[in-house]
Amino acid sequence: MASVRLFFTLISFVFIISTSVYESKVLDPPHVAESFNVSLIQKLGNTCAYTVIISTSCSSTRYTRDQISVAFGDGYGNQIYAPRLDDPSTKTFEQCSSDTFQINGPCTYQICYVYLYRSGPDGWIPNTVKIYSHGSKAVTFPYNTYVPESVWYGFNYCNSASDSNVLAIGLRRSVIILLGFVVAGTTLLL
């Protein structure tokens, strides 16, 4: 009976640890990209199409005159830059709305970062940025916060790729240890 209790305690421990590590990686807030430079964006190789859906928060102003640009890419230096997505005549980035953009750029692997650039007086607030790319799963970046003026602001999970490998190795070890306890517990029960 004690081994069964130990077994369930270990399962709970592994679940709690893996969930807290996962949440800390996924829920990092957006940040100012101090070293991000658009002039470093590559325009070499094949061209691929991307669908970018930017939803504006219901907390944002009713409409915006702000100039909005987006840059995104993968962990291998493949970057896409789209200047001036805003267009007041077509009512882009209105409060509680979603705007879809077709953007062409270098082909990438899995998108792992996105930055928005805002310039203007209105203080636009994006809700989410969702990017669909060729051959990769769609990725959503949850903003729901004010984008500071005249800085690149967003998410960079590219450096987390190695963290996910560490997490996978750690979980694999936990499963092996857990299986060891199961075998030991089963042996004790026999």
UniProtKB/Swiss-Prot annotation:
Signal peptide coordinates: 1-24
Matches recorded under InterPro entries: Embryo-specific_ATS3, PLAT/LH2_dom_sf
Cellular compartment(s): Secreted
SUPFAM superfamilies, sorted: Lipase/lipooxygenase domain (PLAT/LH2 domain) (SSF49723)
Tissue distribution of the protein: Expressed in roots, rosette leaves, stems, cauline leaves and flowers.
Glycosylation sites per record: 37
Domain PLAT: 48-158
Keyword flag Acetylation: no
Highest taxon listed in the record's lineage: Eukaryota
Pfam families: ATS3
Keyword Secreted: yes
Gene Ontology cellular component annotations, sorted alphabetically: extracellular region; plant-type vacuole; plastid
Role this protein plays: May play a role during embryo development.
Binding partners and assembly: Interacts with EULS3 (via N-terminus).
Protein name per the record: Embryo-specific protein ATS3B
Organism: Arabidopsis thaliana (Mouse-ear cress)
Lineage: Eukaryota, Viridiplantae, Streptophyta, Embryophyta, Tracheophyta
